[in-house]
Amino acid sequence: MPPAYQSAFHKIISRDKGVFEGHNFLVSVDTINWIHVNTLTITEQGQLFSSDSKDNHYLLLQSLQSCFIQIYPDSNISGSGKSSISQPPPTTSTRRNLLRKSSNLNSSDQSHSKSSEDNEHQPPAILIKTFDNDKLYIRIPSKANFGNLLSCLMVWQNLKPQGLAKKWYCENKVIEGFNPNAPIYELLVCRFKIYGPLPNKYKNLNIVPGPKAPVYQQKMDDFKANFDNSYIITPQISSDNHNSINEGWFYAMGALNSHGILNFISELDGTLLYSIDIKQILSSEIREMHNSIFNSSNILFIGQLKELRYNNVIRTLSTLTPDQLLTPFLTRDGKIIPNNQRILIEFPLHIDLEDWFVGLNYFAKREYIGSFDNESKLIHNVEHPQLYDFSKANFRVSKKMSIDIIEAKFENTETNKSGKIYAEVRMWGFPWSRTAIVNHTNNPFWKEEFSTDLPISTQMVHILIKKCSFNDSSYSTGDKLIGTVYVTPDILTKQIKTTSTIMTSSESSQAIQMNTVPLSSMASNSNAGLDIVRLTINDPNNIPIGKLLLEVHLQEYHILSPSVFKPLEKMLVNAPMKDLIKFCNENVPSSDFERVSLVLLDIFQSLEVEDDWFKSLMEVELVNVDIMTRKNYHQRNSQDQAVSNSKTQQQSSHNNVFNTLFRGSSIFSKSLEKYNLRIGQEYLEKVFGDFFAKISNEKKNCEVDPRYVRIQERALRKGKSIHEATGLENGQNEDVSDDDDDDDDNSSDDDADYNAEKERERNERIKQMVEENFQNLYGYVEEIWYKIYITSNDLPDQIKLQLKNFRTKVELVCDPEDKVTSLNCLSAFIFLRFFCPAILNPKLFYLAKNHQTGSTQRTLTLIAKILLNFANRQEFSPHKEPHLVRMNVFLRKHTPEIYDYFDKLTGRKNDFNEKILDLSHEVKRFDLGLDKTSNELPTTPYLIDKYLRLTEIVHLLDYSKYVKNIGNNNNGSMSNLGTPVNSPSRDMEREQDRSRSRSQSGTPDLDPILNLSDLKLNYENKYQIGSLEFEKSEFLELTGDNETEGFIKSLCKGNEEIFSFINSNITLKDIQKQSTKIMNKIQELEIYLENYEFPNNYKDQIIWDSFTDDIMNKCWLDTSRNCLIYSDHVPSSNNQYKKLVDHAFSGLKLKFNDHQKLNGNSTMNSLINNGGMGNRNGHDVNGHNNNNNNNNNNTGDGYNETDRNQRLSSTFSTISIGSAIKPNTSKNPFKKWLRKN
């Protein structure tokens, strides 16, 4: 029995799979010159060909993927592509003239009645506009060809064009097994402060003061530019001045339930304020707010970013405005609450933010690059599968961007500049970061870095230079805009060498359609490898007013599904960490130590083996120390005293080496430094936050250097403030101080006695100032050391554990009598790399709102210097810093305490200090109970994206990029290829090369891959997405499979020791092989997704039928332009859009050559409702029996070319649309519209 189809469109799409062939058409590229073609053909590759009577073929359109389709019911076609419906109806005489011009009838002396009759029988036309902006008009005289061609074009509209970014899609992973009838329970509950609409009756709300949150400010320039160039959309502009939503900060209870609904509940009476359906939010719309916006690092943004959503849309397939893409955001009892499409949540602790960030992203729509392939299968067994029930070949995209705003230089020096300015990073109409507020000079300086994750579709970033309008010490939504800087795709992709989702200007034809903005003019840079660029600042009138110096860095990685990384995870847990460290030391430039160290730290911390990682790092770092210690011990116990005496100077140099241990940059020092700052960030905030605010507010003078105090005293005599005097001490206005000295000298010649007395008074006053400043400084140092000392028990246990292990390791390799080196090493990490950087630059660690300048910065510098000397147990010398010698009193007084402090941190003494900070790391973390789909989400704590980091290590360990070099020199060391010239291991490698050339034998201990053949990879062209030959599990990979694990254990007869040996006997080469394998899969998938989509990607008929249903369910007719669009949802209140399956064509008065109108329910409605009737009744166009052909149709997509034409016309036959057409093959149906020539 033949399958039942909902409509003729369903049947044609399901059967023909985008292939078309029809006869007798008129085509044109400008609606003026029309050409008759005998045959039109659409191939399986999406190419549109025409053929003439001599069987000559011509390519009309190269690719139909994501093409724009517009229908012209009559002949009123203009070159601009506007539909006749969007224009006033022309008069009879006007229509007659247009038809005469476009048709050029063979007989120019036809009567008026004949011409009028011809005009009424003009067939409809279809405009095809490809994604690459090629246009073609086609006039179609036959109903059968019209229906079949339109069905075919609908298939190609839903196939994506070339480019990775075009394969963007989003999906809810949780909905796949979602049961709406399942009991609702709460996953997360928290009391927090939110910024959102205040309910009308908010007496029961705990409203608190706070900074006003910015609302959406439109910056889009081309919402009006539609793909068909026919309509001008003027969106409503939302600004602060017209914001009528009453918003504010208030406390509320938040509850995220198991159905993905976030409820906000009044904490006083328990009433529901409003709710958000997180399942309607994109994952890129849940974002952490930068500390600079609200002076808090615990604020989360949740909203609908209309510009971001608009950029995700392929414009050829949609005419929806940005506002129409939004869904109801805040609701209460099914009613929409007026809102600004975003709320802000401030959590009490950062660990709360981390838990909620993961929980919200669990329900949100996750974004991928992907497409269906021949291995797409049903994820769940359902009776009537939808397209989203099938798997895709996909990967996640991570685009981490960092912008370091250094300084600006304004060109117009004549303008009187005063007040304060700052820079603001803006995306999608919202600010996401701000610099500190500085003086408005010709050359303002910031040097502040902002890092964030860019969504897939984001191609550009704006940086606004603003001037404070109301308060020079705070930001305001009404601050004046001075200029704008555009960070364009060309700048973002300077260092990306692989396939990227960001399209540069040279690839604009393939880029996502986005806002057109002026390109910034870059200054010539001789070193293209540098990230530092100088971009033009344009004022609101788009006139250049200066340059902004900034450093832009973007890293893009394509991340496969977590299952691909399981074997690699198993290997890294049991990895030979020392070999890995040696590999990094030999192949990673010192400039990349910090980045690679953080990657490795994140990996091993997420795998919960960071303790083993740090132990290996320590042992590798201390090897040279151990060797040096042994040499010193041998020299000290040598029988030859003469030799011993001659080595005295060398031993002294060795002692200097011990004193400077771990003061430089290495993978270990960078890893432990990052680890301590990550774990101890909250500790620093609670210990130092109030202290820095106190120093900034009190503004006490702590300068104890008499030279600077003399300058301050002189400035005070001139009536200047201490702040201005501090400007003098920092090197400003040096000429003024010199003039003062000259004045003093000149006056001293006139009256020596009087000036001598005055000078004595001045010296006495300076002495008093120094004493007063010393007491201020001493008090601050006492206070900060007291805060550090009494909170030794509050320092996170993770930090203390690493310091304990570190001290033990150092003592083992040092001389037994050496009690100094280990303490100096502790000081290098706990003070030099932890406390002192936070003191010197509080804003960098979010401990202060603005940069510390003037006397405050000088005070902090002195405090850090004193603490560092104190930690090193080193007194100040009268020869170097005589003004700080008096602080030796503090050092001697508290020396026992510093020893006691180090012993407590490293577990040598019991710490009986009471815990007073109540840090969040003491709070027990609970399991959210999420399913396996949460594996790809960041891990808690610290929101580590484990699979991003594994992808980065795969790129680091992959050797396939060196294939050419290996082919040229098979005997060369692989490590040499990646080792920088300034690497500390280069000398050792050169020595190894010389030894290798002499002996022609011997390999490094690491046994690096000398030839790619060592990897034993099969490079035959058998890589196919899904069936991937290289995915076949090798022995080591089998440990990642539970069933295979059991099988191996059974082979080992249950011997756990043998199985553990298999699992732990991993070499670096094994990890490199696995990395190369994953890298190959990423590259293969990139190539596949970079290409166009084709119908043959849907191999299975079941998935093709689901694809057909998906096309018809999303297809709408925009009646204002008569074009087809595709969307999951269209505003129900808008009558502009009609669903195709709901008789959308009934309003089009389509006229064909048989004088029958496709109008009303009797014609086109029968096309929708009675699809395939002709075949089911067993008749062809002429009414003849066609049962054999019908039986062939039931076989699915298999049919031969000989009956293609007959079958193409059978579904849209005259019987299926309820009318009869008399065939007329003897005459050309377009004869009366063709020109004479």
From Swiss-Prot:
Question: In which residue ranges is the amino acid composition biased (Acidic residues)?
Answer: 735-754
Disulfide connectivity for this sequence is none
**What does the entry list under GO cellular component?**
cell cortex; cell septum; cellular bud neck; fungal-type cell wall; hyphal tip; incipient cellular bud site
Composition-biased stretches, type Low complexity, lie in: 79-110, 1183-1199
Mark out the compositionally biased spans (Basic and acidic residues). Answer: 111-121, 986-996
- Which signals induce this protein? Expression is increased in low iron conditions.
User: Which keywords does this Swiss-Prot/TrEMBL entry list?
Assistant: Cell adhesion, Coiled coil, Cytoplasm, GTPase activation, Virulence
Q: Which InterPro entries match?
A: C2_dom (IPR000008), C2_domain_sf (IPR035892), Ras_GTPase (IPR039360), RasGAP_CS (IPR023152), RasGAP_dom (IPR001936), Rho_GTPase_activation_prot (IPR008936)
Q: Where is this region: Disordered?
A: 79-124, 721-762, 969-1007, 1170-1204
Question: What CDD domains is this protein classified in?
Answer: C2 (cd00030), RasGAP_CLA2_BUD2 (cd05137)
Q: What does this protein do?
A: GTPase activating protein (GAP) for RSR1 which is involved in the polarization of yeast and hyphal cells. Directs the site of new daughter cell growth in yeast and hyphal cells. Important for hyphae to maintain linear growth and necessary for hyphal responses to directional cues in the environment (tropisms). Required for correct localization of the septin rings and stabilization of the polarisome at hyphal tips. Involved in cell adhesion.
Protein name, UniProt field? GTPase activating protein BUD2
Which species is this record about? Candida albicans (strain SC5314 / ATCC MYA-2876)
